[in-house]
């Protein structure tokens, strides 16, 4: 993904792969109040853990006071009410879990934050400290007969030559949420369906 380039986080961090230091924010009065929501998809496919860990995924980072990050547990990118669960050509059924109730509530929270100064709830996300942010092969998915379990994430690496691309020599460590005994993500916003 072209947007997967350091800096990933609103916290100021140093990137050992590129030698750069930076943040998505400038650290001045122009920085917005920011709420970012992510589904499980963003953790597995786009490296969303890099929003709240150092680039090598060794420690949680403290986000600035004007930034919140929320993972909506057990949801997929583009999930919606009434989405079909028929697997189509895929092995596993599609996920019918709808993230929109949380997104709507957080939009109201953002409006209240901007208009009246009422801060939204603290970030809700998996963390290294809490033991809920793990390597993709350490999630703890229970065995489900006939179901394939993903054990790898998409690689996130510093961008190279877009004309004559070569495989990256190094990549960032992307992590995902640990699951509970039922196979549901153990952290983030767990909506009533979960």
What is the role of each PLM region?
Residues 1-194:
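C-terminal His-loop and adjacent cap/lid subdomain of alpha/beta-hydrolase
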């Amino acid at each position: 993904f072209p947007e997967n380039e350091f800096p990933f986080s609103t916290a100021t961090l140093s990137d050992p792969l590129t030698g750069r230091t930076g943040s998505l924010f400038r650290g001045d009065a122009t920085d917005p109040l920011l709420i970012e929501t992510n589904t499980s998809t963003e953790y597995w496919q786009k490296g969303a853990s890099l929003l709240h860990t150092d680039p090598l995924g060794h420690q949680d980072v403290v986000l600035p006071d004007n930034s919140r990050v929320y993972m909506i547990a057990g949801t997929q990118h583009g999930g919606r009410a009434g989405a079909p669960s028929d697997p189509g050509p895929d092995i596993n059924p599609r996920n019918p879990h709808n993230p929109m109730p949380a997104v709507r509530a957080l939009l109201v929270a953002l409006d209240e934050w901007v208009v009246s100064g009422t801060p939204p709830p603290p970030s809700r996300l998996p963390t290294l400290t809490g033991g809920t942010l793990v390597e993709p092969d350490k999630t703890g998915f229970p065995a489900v007969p006939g179901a394939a379990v993903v054990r790898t994430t998409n690689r996130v690496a510093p961008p190279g030559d877009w004309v004559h691309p070569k495989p990256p020599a190094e990549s960032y460590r992307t992590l995902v949420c640990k699951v509970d005994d039922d196979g549901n993500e153990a952290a983030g916003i767990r909506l009533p369906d979960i």
